[in-house]
Each structure stands twice: as structure tokens, then as C-alpha cells.
């Protein structure tokens, strides 16, 4: 199983476009050949960002996505503070990637990260899906309510 870290923009995109490439990565990371790695700081950012009213997601969809991340994510506690990214808030994704020894950090904003950090490649959802020929059928509703 390949470990990955997902930038918050991938989670947001997955919820806004449930049949897009970010949604495919998200589904694979929650129950496929990929394993989502998450830290407390990353989870807190996911929760804060996807709950913003401008994204217009129902409370049920938000709760379902967060529950799936909590239950199926591989939780790590980074011990090293990094100062690599121009935006200090992005460093937590590299810290998690380093602590979990992930192969890929998937983002929609490649310019926010170095192309590679230690053994972690920073890629888009499309690049990650192509790199391993990963495909998934994403149902109309990725997250079940209840």
C-alpha cells in the first residue's frame, strides 16, 4: 500500500467535484491501494476549510468526509518542524510526509512546494493516477450520509 498526503485543496476539490481526479485520489486513499496519512494539524485544516460556507457542502457531507478521514487515515505525529515552503502553513504537509515516509504528496498547487522533499514526490492528482495507472469508478455520491 502506497502512503500519500493530500493537500487541503485536493479534499476541497473532491467534495466540490465528486467525479473529478481529486475525488478519485481521495476514494483510493480511503479504501484502495493508497493510504492517506494525516496529522492533527492537517486534519484541523481540512475541517476548518471544508466547513467554510462558500463551499456550500451540507453538514452531512462534511461530517461523512471527516469521519472517513478520522477512521481510515493513518495518523502520524510529526516531530520535526520544517521551514521549506513560502507559505508557512504548507510546511505541515511536508512534515507529515516526512514523518510517515510517504511516496507522494498530492496537491493542486505544485508551485507551493518543492518538486521533491527527501523521498516524497510532490505531484498533481492526474500525475499520481497516471504514475501507477490507478483508476477508480467514483459514484455520484462519494460519501454516504449516516
Question: What spans do the regions from the language model cover?
Answer:
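Membrane interface segments of multi-pass transport proteins and intramembrane proteases
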Residues: 55-56
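Short, well-structured alpha-helical segments
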Residues: 59-70
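Residues that mark the start of a beta-strand
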Residues: 1-3
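PIN/NYN-family metal-dependent endoribonuclease catalytic core
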Residues: 5-6, 16, 21-51
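Short secondary-structure boundary segments
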Residues: 8, 40, 108-110
Amino acid at each position: 500500500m502506497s502512503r500519500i498526503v493530500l493537500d487541503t485543496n485536493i479534499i476541497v476539490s473532491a467534495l466540490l467535484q465528486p467525479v473529478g481526479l481529486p475525488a478519485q485520489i481521495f476514494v483510493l486513499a480511503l479504501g484502495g491501494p493508497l493510504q492517506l496519512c494525516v496529522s492533527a494539524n492537517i486534519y484541523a485544516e481540512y475541517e476548518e476549510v471544508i466547513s467554510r460556507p462558500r463551499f456550500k457542502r451540507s453538514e452531512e457531507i462534511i461530517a461523512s468526509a471527516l469521519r472517513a478521514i478520522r477512521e481510515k487515515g493513518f495518523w502520524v505525529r510529526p516531530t520535526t518542524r520544517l521551514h521549506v515552503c513560502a507559505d508557512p502553513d504548507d510546511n505541515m504537509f511536508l512534515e507529515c510526509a516526512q514523518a510517515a515516509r510517504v511516496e507522494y504528496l498530492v496537491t493542486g498547487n505544485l508551485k507551493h512546494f518543492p518538486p521533491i522533499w527527501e523521498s516524497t514526490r510532490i505531484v498533481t492528482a492526474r500525475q499520481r493516477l497516471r504514475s501507477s495507472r490507478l483508476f477508480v469508478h467514483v459514484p455520484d455520491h462519494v460519501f454516504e450520509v449516516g
